[in-house]
Amino acid sequence: NAALYQFLGLVFKNEKINDERIEIPAIEGDMGGKKYYMFSIEPDLLLKIGFVLHRAKANESEFPTYQRLLQPARLKGITKFINDGGYFPNSIIVNFSGKNKNKLHFEFFKTTKNSSSKLGVLKITNAYAIAYIIDGQHRLYGYANSQYKDSNTIPVVAFDGLDSIEQLQLFMDINENQKAVSATLRLDLEEDLYWDSPVAASRLKALRSSII
């Protein structure tokens, strides 16, 4: 479960799981003067190599810590959503910190005349807690108890070598500039989404949304 993955990361941080590198097709790009990689990975793998800097005593040696503790009720809801066929197409954002040198190796294959992005294979050391989860912790840990943690693949944007202050700034930028869907817009969208649903309860939900 989610607690087990966090425990493994805390106790065995930076220790190899095995000597075989994880190899993933990836795209290398630059954004804001920072190098990053885009790839798709099975949640179980990312849960092992990822780690969340929670604001807790266990992480006092790491500074700054910026993530709130995982919420069990929210995780349970996300797990059910995933097991019922739901999915989140937005990327998990991680950082392989400068402390973890040589954890990444990008094997370049190809580029095109239309883009400076590079296509290749990203080789990642298979070790616990080498990538900090900056955004998407609940989406990721929602897979911990899911039947799809080994078969689904989730999108990831991975930075290489952001320092702790840059990580904190990125976390703040993401959370300050994201805007939640307003209650009014949500009702309008639910009406459109469920109006012709074959499920009676969903059609009733659409009707309620149109009346409110």
Question: What is the meaning of each model-derived region?
Answer:
Residues 1, 87-212:
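Basic- and aromatic-enriched surface patches that contact anionic nucleotides/nucleic acids
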Residues 1-89, 96-103:
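N-terminal extension/subdomain marker
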